[in-house]
């Protein structure tokens, strides 16, 4: 594998955590767009998302969607083999963030408080493996590879990683120590948007940005990298819009109507209001999970993002709804409070 990486100009792994958030999801997305089948799948997915945005499904589901997770820990040095407690801390954060139960949601300026969404999704470590055997929902693989890239090597045992579990039954999360873009830039994680190959479906996160304890390091030690990347896995774009065909950054869109137009990603912890694209007086919604701010400053999804996620759950991720319905035949379904339609 070393020769392959060096041919791209990446000579050695760095143990430094990036000081600013960088995500490789769009790099993976643009690579997959070279495939005609992926383009067709994405067109169908976006057409459904547009219908939902236009009111095709005005009222969201009441039942909680519960998604089984398998965490593949791929480690080289012993300290990279993160603890069960660190993994559980990440699951706990996801269940707060996707249910609007995070205490720091109070940071949202009052002008946007009515937009904060409960996405109605909960996550749990899988209790059965693909063969029906009991499992902790965690796999552990020691590797000789010292770093991985957005080319998905971590997702295959043949290249030093671990093979995915069936993507229609589990959310696969790979955790590794060092992760780089194709040009050698250190990144915190990346996700594959719905519509791509099943064998690479899921998210990848470095251990320094995973969970809230153990190897997690500030400013990415609040578990929000996984929240951000799973947002992509559920078909959310970056809040500033990612389309490269527009020279004017203010012409890009995240395909969500209630997120203000903004020019570029925000980093660190901006002061409110932070104005761009003539979006004053309130400015950028930089506290949104789909921006690039530090963990402690991203605290919300919007109702429009929830609608887009619902389209994803009814479309390319619908297998998880079927599993919820099967489970709930045996027990009373969990419910959530829904906002009144406006």
UniProtKB/Swiss-Prot annotation:
Transmembrane segments: none annotated. GO terms for molecular function: metal ion binding; metallopeptidase activity. It comes from Methanosarcina acetivorans (strain ATCC 35395 / DSM 2834 / JCM 12185 / C2A). This is Ulilysin. The active site is at 229 (proton acceptor). Binds 2 calcium ions per subunit. Binds 1 zinc ion per subunit. It holds the Pfam family Peptidase_M43. Its cofactor is Ca(2+); Zn(2+). Monomer. Residues 323-342 form a propeptide. Consists of two subdomains separated by an active site cleft containing the catalytic zinc ion.
């Amino acid at each position: 594998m070393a020769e392959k990486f060096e041919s791209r100009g990446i000579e050695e792994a760095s143990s430094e955590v990036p000081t600013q958030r960088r995500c490789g999801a769009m790099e993976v997305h643009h690579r997959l767009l070279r495939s005609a089948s992926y383009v067709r799948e994405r067109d169908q997915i976006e057409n459904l998302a547009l219908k939902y945005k236009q009111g095709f499904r005005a009222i969201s589901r009441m039942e909680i969607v519960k998604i089984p997770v398998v965490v593949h820990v791929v480690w080289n040095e012993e300290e990279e083999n993160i603890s069960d407690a660190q993994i559980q801390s990440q699951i706990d954060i996801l269940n707060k963030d996707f249910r609007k139960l995070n205490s720091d949601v109070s940071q949202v300026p009052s002008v946007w408080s009515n937009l904060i969404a409960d996405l109605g999704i909960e996550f749990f470590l899988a209790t059965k493996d693909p063969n029906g055997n009991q499992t902790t929902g965690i796999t552990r693989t020691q590797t000789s590879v010292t770093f991985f890239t957005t080319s998905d090597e971590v997702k295959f045992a043949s290249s030093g990683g671990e093979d995915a579990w069936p993507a229609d039954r589990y959310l696969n999360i790979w955790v590794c120590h060092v992760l780089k873009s194709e040009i050698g830039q250190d990144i915190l994680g990346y996700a594959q948007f719905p519509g791509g190959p099943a064998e690479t479906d899921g998210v990848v996160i470095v251990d320094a940005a995973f969970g809230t304890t153990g190897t997690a390091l500030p400013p990415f030690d609040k578990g929000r990298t996984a929240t951000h990347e799973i947002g992509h896995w559920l078909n959310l774009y970056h809040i500033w819009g990612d389309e490269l065909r527009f020279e004017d950054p203010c012409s890009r869109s995240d395909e969500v109507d209630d997120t203000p137009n903004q020019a570029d990603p925000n980093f660190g912890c901006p002061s409110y209001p932070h104005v761009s694209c003539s979006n004053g007086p309130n400015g950028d919604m930089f506290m949104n999970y789909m921006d690039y701010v530090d963990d402690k400053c991203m605290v919300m999804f919007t109702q429009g993002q929830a609608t887009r996620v619902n389209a994803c759950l009814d479309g390319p991720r619908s297998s998880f709804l079927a599993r919820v319905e099967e489970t709930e035949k045996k027990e009373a379904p969990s419910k959530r409070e829904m906002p009144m339609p406006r």
